[in-house]
């Protein structure tokens, strides 16, 4: 099987793919193209993932995988959604984003939410395929745990009775939105080999 090229410079995302594609060579796009960047102008996770994978597949003339992910809070009509990384504004960090979300949920009873990841796979002269993974949870009123990043310290998973920041990387890989989407992609690729 060919190398798995991921259109990201985020080492954490690359590691998530490597954890599931253990027997294959997974590389980030920066190993093939310097300064690859695509503006995420899509209104959905799928649109943003497609923008990245299609641009990278065109630039490299080979199959490329990209993803877009974020947090959707039901009581906030899906916010922060595609703006999860920049919810508090450009130049702000994870703490600023968490603070804004907690403020927006201050008097809200329904704190149900989900992390969403859409993986897009594009190749020259092939239809782009997408794979969606989710994990459901509840937004806490305060931070718990030190692992992970982003909204993990306030995303409580009832089945585990912990936030995403309180579980190990191995546990997270088994239940996370990105892990779920990567497993769907892997099943598809394994099926492709048997055709």
Curated annotation (Swiss-Prot):
Pfam family, one: Ham1p_like
Cofactor: Mg(2+)
EC number: 3.6.1.66
Cofactor binding note from Swiss-Prot or TrEMBL: Binds 1 Mg(2+) ion per subunit.
Disulfide bridge map: none
Catalyzed reactions: XTP + H2O = XMP + diphosphate + H(+); dITP + H2O = dIMP + diphosphate + H(+); ITP + H2O = IMP + diphosphate + H(+)
Class of enzymatic activity (EC top level): hydrolase
GO cellular component: cytosol
GO molecular function: dITP diphosphatase activity; ITP diphosphatase activity; metal ion binding; nucleotide binding; ribonucleoside triphosphate phosphatase activity; XTP diphosphatase activity
Family affiliation: Belongs to the HAM1 NTPase family.
The protein's assembly and partners: Homodimer.
PANTHER family for this protein: INOSINE TRIPHOSPHATE PYROPHOSPHATASE (PTHR11067:SF9), INOSINE TRIPHOSPHATE PYROPHOSPHATASE/HAM1 PROTEIN (PTHR11067)
Protein name (database record): dITP/XTP pyrophosphatase
Organism: Staphylococcus epidermidis (strain ATCC 12228 / FDA PCI 1200)
């Amino acid at each position: 099987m060919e190398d798995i090229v991921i259109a990201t410079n985020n080492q954490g995302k690359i590691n998530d793919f490597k954890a599931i594609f253990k027997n294959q060579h997974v590389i980030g796009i920066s190993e093939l193209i310097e300064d690859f960047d695509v503006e995420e102008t899509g209104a959905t996770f799928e649109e943003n993932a497609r923008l990245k994978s299609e641009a990278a597949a065109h630039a490299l003339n080979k199959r490329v995988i990209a993803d877009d992910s974020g947090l959707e809070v039901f009581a906030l009509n899906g916010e922060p959604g595609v703006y999860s990384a920049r919810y508090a504004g450009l130049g702000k960090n994870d703490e600023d984003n968490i603070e804004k979300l907690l403020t927006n949920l201050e008097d809200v009873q329904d704190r149900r939410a989900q992390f969403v990841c859409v993986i897009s796979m594009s190749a020259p002269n092939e239809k782009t395929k997408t794979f969606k993974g989710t994990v459901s949870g509840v937004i806490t009123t305060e931070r718990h745990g030190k692992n992970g990043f982003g909204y993990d310290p306030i995303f409580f998973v009832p089945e585990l009775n912990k936030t995403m920041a309180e579980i190990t990387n191995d546990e997270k890989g088994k239940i996370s939105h990105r892990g779920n989407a990567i497993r769907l992609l892997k099943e598809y690729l394994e099926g492709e080999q048997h055709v």
